[in-house]
Amino acid sequence: MAPEVASHVERHCTTIRRGPDYLFHLILDSMVDDYAVVVDRVTASLDSLERGVFKDPSPHQLARLLKLKRTVSRLRKTLVLEREVLARLMRGEFELVNEREIAYYRNVYDHLVRYTELIESAREMVSDLMQTHLAAASNRLNHIMKY
């Protein structure tokens, strides 16, 4: 995060003249951009787990689902809190952001909203996969008990 911001400041010396609120925007934007990688990893893990749950609903798959559920829950909590702080900044609750910089903060806010929605979908999918895993395990146990 910091190297990208430092590089931007070095390349565009006018950044400093725009004030600390613009510099803060650059830092926030860089932080929020890093969430894209995390959300992609969560999505990839979900895809892998989905295939595994339908192929072989093992206790290992359930442990991975529980771990991913905790990760998604923590990430969602973080995203929601950051989104709320940004919303308050844009509403002017803190007199830290110059009016002309609000549009930049709104862009960061929009990204946070998008990532929050993706993580919310991931949270629902984890719950669905857990239900599927438990149903498949129950079916397998019923099948074994028949014989």
Model-assigned labels for residue ranges:
Residues 1-100, 104-121, 127:
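Peripheral, non-transmembrane regulatory/ligand-interaction domains of membrane transport proteins
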Residues 113, 119-147:
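Membrane-interface, cytosolic juxtamembrane amphipathic helix immediately N-terminal to a transmembrane helix
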